[in-house]
Amino acid sequence: MEHNIAEISVSSLTDPHFLRENKNLFIPDTDPPLSKIETINALSELSIGSSQEIQNPDHKTYSKLGFGKPLFTRADRHYVDPPLSNQDVGLISFVPCNDAKPNKYGVYGFAKIRGTFANVDESDQRASELIQKHDSVHKIYHVKVGTPFPIVHPKISSQYAASVKEIDVKADAKNEISRFVKTAGEEDKKVMEELKEREKQLREDVSKTPEQKLNELTPLDQYIYARKRLSDNLFVFEEHRKKLHDVKKVILQAELEADSLEKTNPEVINQYKEKYEKAAKEAGIDKSTDAMAVMIKENFYNKPNLQKIFSENLV
């Protein structure tokens, strides 16, 4: 089934393959954080399975923000959530249902781990912060760490969060996991055999020096290896040379600006030196002998001889 890019809402969870094919990009929204009323409405729709009902502190019902206006502004302001202290790597296991189908790239969809928390109060607080300030587009599901939970279509997610009596989540999870374990058994055995063979090869290789390994190669393999090193390092060399010339342009432009200011405002020279000497003394640069301090004293206090530097050091 072909999709029209105009019909699909692009967000931070949109498949990158789809965006590339349609020459589109995720552009973060710049809308301001949600208001108090908008946050209340957004939480009731987007915070799925929260431990507490979303209460309106004013005890008012807000069905609309105004005539014809939505209940809240839907904005996706960041591709990556603001970081949480001591939370950098997440663990997740996923088993697709028997009739679930990935796209042509083998992708079932995209998800974000929004954080793990010590208690429900902290998780509610983080969900509220994300929805109000960063992402009022995607639903946020509150789940128990280590316990299987279904990944369902957003339109029916409330059914799973509302009552386990209506939908037996545990039974669904048990059946799907059992099916997956059974079908994965042969694949696991094959992988283990490959790992053992690879381990054996590594143990044989670890005792050999790089020279010994190179000498064991055929002349053709040695030639290929040499040409690859030549090509790879030449690419790195060219990239650095381009950057070097870009930096040179910036340096020369800065010199022109400094020369122009010296001519139009000659008093800035002495004022600059006085300010530098004071700052250098406070930072201890005037007495320091390390390479960075010497460079600062040579190139910051006195104007460097660019003609000499560029003639000697540029490749």
Swiss-Prot record:
Coiled coil segments of this chain: 184-212, 238-275
Keywords from the UniProt entry: Coiled coil
InterPro entries in the record: DUF5832 (IPR043872)
Domain of life: Viruses
Family recorded in the similarity comment: Belongs to the IIV-6 287R family.
Name of this chain's protein: Uncharacterized protein 287R
